Amino acid sequence: MTRIAITGGRVLTMDPERRVLEPGTVVVEDQFIAQVGSPTTSTSAAPKSSTPPGWQCSPASSTPTPTSHKSSSGVVHPMTATSSNGCTTCSIPASLPTQTTTSESEHCCTAPKPFVLASPLSSTTRTSDPTTSPAPGPPGSPFTDAGIRAIYARMYFDAPRAELEELVATIHAKAPGAVRMDESASTDHVLADLDQLITRHDRTADGRIRVWPAPAIPFMVSEKGMKAAQEIAASRTDGWTMHVSEDPIEARVHSMNAPEYLHHLGCLDDRLLAAHCVHIDSRDIRLFRQHDVKISTQPVSNSYLAAGIAPVPEMLAHGVTVGIGTDDANCNDSVNLISDMKVLALIHRAAHRDASIITPEKIIEMATIDGARCIGMADQIGSLEAGKRADIITLDLRHAQTTPAHDLAATIVFQAYGNEVNDVLVNGSVVMRDRVLSFLPTPQEEKALYDDASERSAAMLARAGLTGTRTWQTLGS
């Protein structure tokens, strides 16, 4: 049996009582949390002889915390970061096929690696990754190597819309030398591929890797495609995800809002994780609550693409479970959940002119226990409680930006940068110790990864006719 005792710091438990133990101790035995409590009551479960050296934290300097769960993100397009600057929501799906068709298999293998590297460095240990096509080899293999959790959400379009052809043609004209790739596929083809992915890869790597169906957008997926995803979630995968109401065009296509359309089809349920949900009204929110649909809000992505601001305070007021996602690098340029937590808090304060509209405590809940609820794992992760999986981060608050740290929740949300994350455990295994990742133990290996990703990105964008550069664009005279 492997035992680890993390002692000496404040423990943010996120348990039902939201206890903050100061000082506190978390005892880990193999994959599970054995005890959470004061040093005197907990350390007896882990004798010093079994405790790895160095896990004694300086008083008030390190905060053991449940790991963050990014409820929706994307990993295929870190290779295209900043290339979408100035694009709107609708132009992103139209332009990405041009980029993706230039991706060699090696690029698809390299692209997730910077994402995987950045995730634990800024607190994230579980992510949902919607992607339109299977990566070469085992989906999630970079996640397997890194030791973090991942949901490989197989995104698909099986009902392309003629209404978008003019828009796609206009955008494609900007890169006439690029070969356009049609990402749509027949429903039967998609479902056969999804069946194969689930059979081969779901619940692999000690259960850390999951495969979900992910019909892309209601107005570009057939009724058959959506109902099949719902049935697969109920019988095999426990969850499914979809982009919902990110852009107002979804309402125009169906002459009703997307949530109402999904309700009409019987496709709202408690296994659905709906991403974005920007252009929705009070009826839509009531439907989400009625069916216990989970929401992944993407504040930075929605701001980056000028999509709008999701009515998160209204969702919370109605009792809807909301988690936080970063979205992809092509519409965020970062995968730093801690910095996105601050953006989420500030945009709603500004939009409502109400400094108490979302509290830092609620933001922390959305990033931890509510994020776990979004992916159906609140009984296993999301809080530091005996019997749960040992998914834990420690934050070193001895930095200029986090000094002083009077209020723990406010410090994490409003002061932290993300580089305060010092240690990461997933399933009881050490993924990062003193900011050294277990899968990249030397600076040379880390630098080689950055160099490889940069070179492949430049080559990919060049073949797509997207140089990644543009003239300096100022405003005014």
UniProtKB/Swiss-Prot annotation:
Keyword Cell division listed? The answer is no
Q: Does the keyword Hydrolase apply?
A: yes
The record's InterPro entries line, in alphabetical order, gives: Amidohydro-rel (IPR006680), Metal-dep_hydrolase_composite (IPR011059), Metal_Hydrolase (IPR032466), MTA/SAH_deaminase (IPR050287)
- Compositionally biased region (Low complexity): 38-73, 120-132
Primary enzyme class: hydrolase
Q: Name one GO molecular function term.
A: hydrolase activity, acting on carbon-nitrogen (but not peptide) bonds
Q: Where is this region: Disordered?
A: 38-77, 120-143
EC assignment: the record states: 3.8.1.-
Q: What does this protein do?
A: Hydrolytic deamination of the S-triazine substrate melamine.
User: Can you tell me which family this protein belongs to?
Assistant: Belongs to the metallo-dependent hydrolases superfamily. ATZ/TRZ family.
Q: What's the name of the protein?
A: S-triazine hydrolase
Q: Which organism is it from?
A: Gordonia rubripertincta (Rhodococcus corallinus)
The lineage is: Bacteria, Bacillati, Actinomycetota, Actinomycetes, Mycobacteriales
